[in-house]
């Protein structure tokens, strides 16, 4: 997610992967996983800020209020002694929305390439997309000026490839919608304090997925 880069840079994936491996976890940035007849295509995704067809305004709002743009830093210049990575002291320059837009384009290109690739189980195989940011307005909840920093409109991609399901988080709202043949669900775990609110008890089971055959 976006918070994993706080205190570091957007190019820290290799360091985050090392941390994950050190505790026996998988780091699945732009990675494909397989379980039975299901493949999982995983990436952070970020957004294109164009959900409401005004990317320039959305980028301005996001840049002025979101902590991402004050807690994630531009990579130190090549050859500098800054060291890089999630343990180095912040540079004088924070990232801007244009930087995360660039990452979104990269992640989306990777995702489209994977969706175009034949499923190893053929037509019987299922594809589940797992991203941090949301892919559709129908699962965005109440819309305001910040919503385009949480969700993109990937209707065209969903229609073309019809993945079986799309799981995402970021907005911490338990929303679900069928878009064409794709079951889109917010499976956020949420912040620790959210477990203290009775209306958020659903977060305990929000990460569970039951397949169509009940298994």
Residue positions per predicted region:
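Beta-strand-turn-beta hairpins that frame and shape the catalytic cleft
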Residues: 32-42, 47, 178-183
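N-terminal active-site segment of His-dependent metallophosphoesterases
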Residues: 5-11, 15, 97, 123-124, ...
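Binuclear metal-dependent phosphoesterase catalytic core
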Residues: 141, 145-164, 172-215
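A conserved beta-strand/loop element that lines the FAD pocket in flavoprotein oxidoreductases
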Residues: 25-28
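Active-site glycine-centered loops adjacent to acidic/histidine catalytic or metal-binding residues
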Residues: 1-2, 132, 169-170
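Metal-dependent catalytic neighborhoods of phosphoester/phosphodiester hydrolases
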Residues: 2-22, 51-53, 139-144, 175-180, ...
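Active-site-proximal loop/helix segment associated with metal-binding centers of metalloenzymes
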Residues: 41-127, 135-138
């Amino acid at each position: 997610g976006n918070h994993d880069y706080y205190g570091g840079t957007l190019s820290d994936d290799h360091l985050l992967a090392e941390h994950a491996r050190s505790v026996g976890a998988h780091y699945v940035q732009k990675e494909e996983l397989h379980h039975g007849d299901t493949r999982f295509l995983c990436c952070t995704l970020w957004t294109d800020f164009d959900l409401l067809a005004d990317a320039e305004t959305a980028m301005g709002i996001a840049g002025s209020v979101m902590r991402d743009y004050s807690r994630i830093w531009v990579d130190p210049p090549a050859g500098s002694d800054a060291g890089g990575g999630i343990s180095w002291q912040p540079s004088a320059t924070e990232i801007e929305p244009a930087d995360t837009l660039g990452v979104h384009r990269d992640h989306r290109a990777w995702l489209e390439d994977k969706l175009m690739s034949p499923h190893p189980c053929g037509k019987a195989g299922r594809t589940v997309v797992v991203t941090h940011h949301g892919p559709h307005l129908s699962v965005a909840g109440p819309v305001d000026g910040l919503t385009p920093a949480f969700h993109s409109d990937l209707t065209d991609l969903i229609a073309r490839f019809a993945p079986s399901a799309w799981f995402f988080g970021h907005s911490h709202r338990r929303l679900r919608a069928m878009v064409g043949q794709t079951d889109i669900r917010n499976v956020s775990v949420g912040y620790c304090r959210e477990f203290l609110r009775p209306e958020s008890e659903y977060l305990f089971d929000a990460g569970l997925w039951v397949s169509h055959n009940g298994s």
